[in-house]
């Protein structure tokens, strides 16, 4: 009977421990945040060699947005701030007003939704679309496969859009095309990849929408593989975060999205060339106005309807943030070229890194209890299976 009693006690203790482990300690929003508004840089990026993504030739006006469900209020207990589907964020526009139609800031290690602004509002994502294109290529393709560019893949592209200058009949590996897609934001690489994976771009777009549904994206509908303007092509900041998190599970994606240069070897039709990133958060060689040493990778986007867009990941100390910016300014106060998405991303990251830290409260290396064992001289040490952290302000 004593053995049974001890086993019951042990079972109850372990059950309580696992419940504790599945929870984090209460989190409360910072009541006062001392932040001064950062004035936007009005200096334009040099235009002599900048590989800026090109907007569509035809002006299409302001983006049409679909009214989302009412967003939940800020603050709340810890469970309401947890995960990419969190109904609440710790802060929003009242605490920090940023140049963006929508902005999401998620701390990845703790899965804490730190900042949210219109994250369920449907907007055009421009070339952030290409993260989904890259994800499906990594999921279904072989990086070393040879792919021949078809004329059909190039026929419907806007010649003024961002491009790697692919030629019909030119042969690349899938890996090379993914670098074109992500580094130079090449519109011409997207349909070529789509034809390789699915046989046609429409079939690939169907796969994109199926994958979005699989990832729990409830405000997304893709109409093309590159992100150029289409009334039926839209997503949300929250959905883009889900897509980015899925892509980050691939080491090759992390390698590609963090590269600022790539040497594209000579092909059967063209000489060797160097691909240069459109992401000035990770590359200061063209302009240092937007460089942020904390940012380790990301993807940019821009069309006139979508505005400046960026998704990036940044690290500092024990914090790792995913930031999604949609609909930021593209023109400075003096009318010059301006990258409001980069400025807003850095300001959001400043807020996240400066306002919060995380401390380990339970460690797999430190026992939390010693349980006696009946008819034995030694006790059993109980330790967490994983580290448990909580936020400290």
Regions found by a protein language model. Give the residues of each.
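Active-site-adjacent loops and short helices of periplasmic peptidoglycan-processing enzymes
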Residues: 20-32, 37, 42, 48, ...
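Short, low-complexity interaction segments enriched in Ser/Thr/Pro/Gly
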Residues: 2-5, 49
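Domain-terminus/edge residues, biased toward the C-terminal soluble/receptor-binding domains
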Residues: 217-218, 232-234, 238-393
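Sec-dependent N-terminal signal peptides of Gram-positive bacterial secreted proteins and lipoproteins
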Residues: 4-28
């Amino acid at each position: 009977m004593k053995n049974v009693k001890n086993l019951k006690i042990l079972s109850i203790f372990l059950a309580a421990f696992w419940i504790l482990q599945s929870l984090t300690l209460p989190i409360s929003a910072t009541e006062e945040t001392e932040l001064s508004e950062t004035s936007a840089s009005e200096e334009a990026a040099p235009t002599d060699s900048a590989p800026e993504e090109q907007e569509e030739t035809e002006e299409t006006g302001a983006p049409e947005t679909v009214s989302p469900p009412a967003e939940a209020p800020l603050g709340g207990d810890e469970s309401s701030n947890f995960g990419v589907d969190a109904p609440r964020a710790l802060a929003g526009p009242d605490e920090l007003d940023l140049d963006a139609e929508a902005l999401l800031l998620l701390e990845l290690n703790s899965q804490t939704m730190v900042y949210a602004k219109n994250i369920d509002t449907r907007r055009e994502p421009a070339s952030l679309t290409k993260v989904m294109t890259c994800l499906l290529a990594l999921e279904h393709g072989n990086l070393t496969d040879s792919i021949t560019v078809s004329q059909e893949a190039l026929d419907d592209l806007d010649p003024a859009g961002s491009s790697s200058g692919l030629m019909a009949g030119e042969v690349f590996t899938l890996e090379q095309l993914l670098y074109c897609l992500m580094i130079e934001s090449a519109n011409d690489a997207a349909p070529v990849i789509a034809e390789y994976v699915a046989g046609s771009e429409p079939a690939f777009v169907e796969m994109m929408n199926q994958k979005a549904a699989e990832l729990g994206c409830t405000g997304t509908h893709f109409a093309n593989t590159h992100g150029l303007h289409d009334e039926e092509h839209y997503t949300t900041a929250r959905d883009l975060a889900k897509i980015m998190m899925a892509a980050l599970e691939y080491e090759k994606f992390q390698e590609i999205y963090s590269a600022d240069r790539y040497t594209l070897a000579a092909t059967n039709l063209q000489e060797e060339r160097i691909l240069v990133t459109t992401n000035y958060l990770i590359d200061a060689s063209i302009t240092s106005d937007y460089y942020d040493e904390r940012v380790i990778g990301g993807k940019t986007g821009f069309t006139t309807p979508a505005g400046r867009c960026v998704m990036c990941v940044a690290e500092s100390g024990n914090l790792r943030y995913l930031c999604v910016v949609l609909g930021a300014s593209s023109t400075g106060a003096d009318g010059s070229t301006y990258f409001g998405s980069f400025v807003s991303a850095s300001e959001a990251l400043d807020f996240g890194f400066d306002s919060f830290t995380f401390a380990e409260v339970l460690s797999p290396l430190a026992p939390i209890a010693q349980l006696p064992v009946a008819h034995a001289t030694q006790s059993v040490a109980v330790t967490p299976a994983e580290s448990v952290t909580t936020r400290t302000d």
